[in-house]
């Protein structure tokens, strides 16, 4: 986004939605604004809970809201990244408004997760593809995407890591007013959204194992707007 802003040939419109706007997920749109990135529109999907029915209803709200914005600005292309379910409404809206879609990080595989179907659906709705490596590029072509529209550009997050000024342990301790133990474990748990109830049992097993690591500092990453995310969050909070 920052590189596009530097190029006078491009005019970008940033649309922010879903968990970025939710207070319980940290209202992370403020981080976008603090990076001096202008947000053109904030679209709330009004997600009331982590139940499948509420997530499904929020997609309908998204299609209506995105259609209104895209019809007004009618960009030359819509750029999306990844496999978040919230991308489907904007892709459907773009398709029906005859706006081409560019998709980053297609062709990947996450078995056991709804992300698998979502990602491949977005790829089939898209016109230009920017996968992260040659394996993913070949998979897109095998799915029927035109080879001359598939560009292996590598993982864009690598540039973010390379250019980011990383914090040292002491800075984190001061900021959060904590003291790390000598050994640290970083834990991320992603529910298998196809079988969410099974995932909760799996998380309980993980926590039972982690309970044995008394001499470690355990850092859990937060949840996103996924099925059963509230249950995951509650289990982790009770554990810590």
Please report, for each region that a protein language model flagged, where it lies by residue.
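Conserved nucleotide-sugar phosphate-binding/catalytic loop shared by glycosyltransferases and other
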Residues: 11-58, 65
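Short, surface-exposed alpha-helical segments at coil->helix boundaries
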Residues: 25-30, 116-119, 230-234
